Amino acid sequence: MARKELSALNIQTGPLGSDAADIIAPAAKHGLRVQNIARSFGDRQVVRDVSLNVQRGEVFGLLGPNGAGKTTCFYMITGLIPADSGSIWLDNEDITQLPMYQRARMGLGYLAQEASIFRGMSVEQNVRSVVELRHKSETTIREETNRLLEELRIDHLRNAPATALSGGERRRVEIARALAGKPSFMLLDEPFAGIDPLAIADIRQVIRYLSGQGIGVLITDHNVRETLDIIDRVSIMTSGAVLFEGTAQEAVESAEVRNAYLGEMYG
């Protein structure tokens, strides 16, 4: 399926391409669905009636300027903070009131911006420690650990201490740990933060790998260019509400989005 060039940025849409994004029904009953969620802190409403829908195999971006409410919205989806109103669904299951660990058991993986690996362990031990939570057989644990190390291309680092990893290598280990939980969706909080340009390209490959495995990916990041490069669709938030939803190409071409968020350098 052909991908549409994002001529203004010299980038391309994500692995599904905009044609695939066009056929994703907004009212689909499957996938990760967020319906009219809202959140206030005291008298200040920071998220107002936000809705979005992410399908398996799709890479979806949640973007916006500082103070737009995207981080609060993202945290409500992960279960880090509760929503005041609205609902969050994982396929046909209402997970709105479930704590974060139960959402994870149901297939909602989360990669925090902050480092989440065990610094006192090797790469292999970091991955194995999560695999052991799901399996009891030593053979299965060993095979699953090896599979994740190989698929995330960190097998050569298996004996390296976590403290010796670069930013990109650490991200790969963290994603391998998250994949050990067999998620159907992955929420990536600032995946491009704190890593160099070469590592950014590396993480983009990992995100494409996740999508290719049929895992839905929801990204929030301040690195606009890199995020638009990888996503299939995007919601742009301003002042606590969704200003725009569409493909990356459509976002770049939108005068409304440029005026509120991207700026004229994207025009």
Question: Locations of the language-model features?
Answer:
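Conserved ABC ATPase signature
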Residues: 161-165, 169
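ABC ATPase NBD coupling module
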Residues: 82, 94-114, 138-142, 212, ...
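Conserved ABC ATPase "signature" region
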Residues: 139-157, 204-208
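The feature captures the beta-strand-to-loop junction immediately N-terminal to the Walker
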Residues: 63-65
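Conserved catalytic motifs of ABC-family nucleotide-binding domains
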Residues: 182
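Catalytic Walker B motif of ABC-type/P-loop ATPase nucleotide-binding domains
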Residues: 186-190
